[in-house]
């Protein structure tokens, strides 16, 4: 399965369009993604992947991958190709509007003259 979406909400302020392509492997064991930030350079970007509070993330030694361990079920490995990642705090709002602390994976970097392309994947382990 392939999903493609774009968002132009940053175009007025930053002159930027965010396009995301997501591909699911037939067996469901891997998700590949590509984020294209299309626009002029001169800015930095942050791509944020917010995690559910029941998922604990740990950055691995290569600084480009994180181990994602849910309370139950199989773990996953998030890998960003050619980019370092970081973990930051986030907030999760459930259906009852209760706020819970959680984590987010952040991919960051500078925009080139025509934007940036970030490739990533989630692999079941």
Regions found by a protein language model. Give the residues of each.
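CBM-like, beta-strand-rich accessory domains located in the C-terminal region of large
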Residues: 1-125
